[in-house]
Design a protein with these regions (language model features):
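A detector of single, family-specific signature residues
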Residues: 1-456
Length: 456
């Protein structure tokens, strides 16, 4: 019986000979709230794994130690927001910093410790097995921060409106049943008068705007309620908070406008479009956002049906204006999580749903796709056909995928979008159906004959 061949016993830290080290000067960092665990290649330091605190001085000391260990590239997981300060400091020292998805770095069960985690990251990065996450340029990151803050403020203002509505309902003031929005001109005027101490329903009804359909008598009847001191106190505070958030939203809009004007332009300054109406909803910026976005991107993305100016703003703040980060439009759609994630085993597709990604741009595209349900454009007709065939959820994803590809082509190649209209789309679809029916008939040794020829 032949003896089994003896295998050479690997020493600690020795790599598998079947893998080729692409990044020999790589370090791995396990990011945490209070401590960061850092691993460097074996032999660079008597203690290749060290722990550093999260204070700024500790982060600078970490960067200096990595320099002393001749490290050139660093990898870390995108853990909450703990990695951001560390990323910026390491980048200022000249390191190539890679931020990876934690789902792509999972190790075996039962081997999850901080020390093993940073060593595992360092090993994976050494062999080039990790993909760096997308991080937009600095000016896009600043814009994204402003827009996310504005979104938080709008959400907080909406919460205040809900609190005011709840308080009115508790006092049986049925104002919301006669006007469509209590945060409009009429609603806010009445609320401010109530907070100021006015209880006469006839006088409160005089604040009715001309565009409100309900009569003054109907509004006066809806304002007959059970005035309670504690609920009026809640109403007053909710109104004050709402005014504060509206003020902060306006300040945020000014900051966004200033930053947009400093961003690189791809077009010559254009003549300003129509001014923003004073009665515009609070979600709409108080400056001409469309012209600024056209100047930055070089194209007018709002020509695409479903893409409103704020949708375009959200997409740009998440993906930027440089489409060269994705080689093809398919890669762009895959990054957004808008394409099938096929799981194949044994020659069979086990799962074909989309990947679960947390991406505000993808969410904005899905909302834009759903807004096409009543659009009289070619995209609207296409979406309604997909909805009847696939159902709403799949149709929304499919149309969001199509919108993403259109945005990619327009921003990368500078092409303008021309909507051919619903009639042109229906005509083209009818021709495709006729061609398919003729092919099916030919396969059965039959022939299609128009109904007019039969009757004649």
């Amino acid at each position: 019986m032949a003896k089994a061949a003896k295998t050479k016993k690997k020493t600690k830290g020795e790599w598998d000979e079947g893998l080729f080290a692409l990044n020999r000067n790589a370090a791995g960092i396990d990011v945490g709230n209070a401590d960061h665990y850092v691993a460097v290649p074996i032999g660079r330091d008597p203690e290749p794994v060290q722990t550093f605190g999260s204070f700024t001085s500790d982060l600078h000391r970490m960067a200096q130690w990595l320099k002393a260990c001749r490290v050139e590239t660093v990898v870390m997981q995108a853990t909450g927001v703990y990695w951001i300060a560390l990323f910026q400091i390491l980048e200022s020292y000249g390191f190539q910093v890679n931020v990876v998805n934690a789902r792509h770095t999972k190790t075996l069960q039962g081997r999850k410790t901080d020390v093993l985690e940073c060593q595992w990251l360092q090993k994976l990065h050494t062999f080039g097995l990790l993909n760096n996450s997308f991080r937009p340029p600095e000016e896009i990151q600043i814009l994204r921060t402003y827009l996310r803050q504005r979104e938080n403020l709008v959400t907080a203002a909406s919460t205040c409106i809900q609190h005011m509505q709840k308080t009115l309902t508790q006092m049986n003031v049925q104002l919301a049943n006669v006007i469509s929005d209590i945060s409009g001109v009429t609603g806010m005027a009445i609320l401010r008068a109530i907070v100021a101490g006015e209880r006469d329903t006839e006088r409160l009804a005089t604040y009715k705007h001309n565009r409100v359909r309900a009569s003054r008598e109907e509004i006066a009847r809806s304002l007959e309620g059970n005035w309670r001191e504690e609920l009026l106190f809640v109403l007053e505070q909710s109104l004050q908070l709402y005014d504060l958030y509206v003020e902060k939203i306006a300040a945020c809009d000014q900051q966004i406008e200033r930053h947009l004007k400093t961003m690189t332009s791809k077009l010559e300054p254009v003549q300003p479009s129509d001014p923003i109406a004073l009665s515009a909803p609070r979600e709409q910026p108080r400056f001409n956002l469309k012209d600024q976005l056209c100047r930055i991107t070089g194209v007018d993305l709002t020509r695409v049906a479903g893409l409103e100016v704020q949708t375009v703003q959200t997409i740009i703040s998440e993906v930027g204006v440089d489409m060269s980060r994705w080689n093809t439009e398919k890669q762009f759609a895959s990054w957004l999580g808008l394409c099938p994630d096929n799981r194949i085993s044994g020659g069979k597709v086990l799962k074909s749903g989309t990947r679960h990604v947390v991406n505000r741009a993808a969410t904005a595209l899905r909302l834009a796709a759903w807004s096409l349900i009543r659009s009289q454009s070619a995209l609207g007709a296409n979406f309604r056909r997909l909805r009847s065939k696939l159902g709403a959820p799949k149709a929304i994803t499919a149309m969001a995928h199509k919108l993403a590809r259109l945005i990619y082509r327009m921003m990368k190649f500078g092409a303008d979008y021309v909507d051919k209209g619903m009639a042109a789309y229906e005509s083209k679809y009818r021709q495709q159906q006729m061609k398919w029916l003729a092919k099916q008939a030919a396969s059965l040794n039959l022939q299609l004959i128009p109904a007019q020829e039969i009757t004649s």
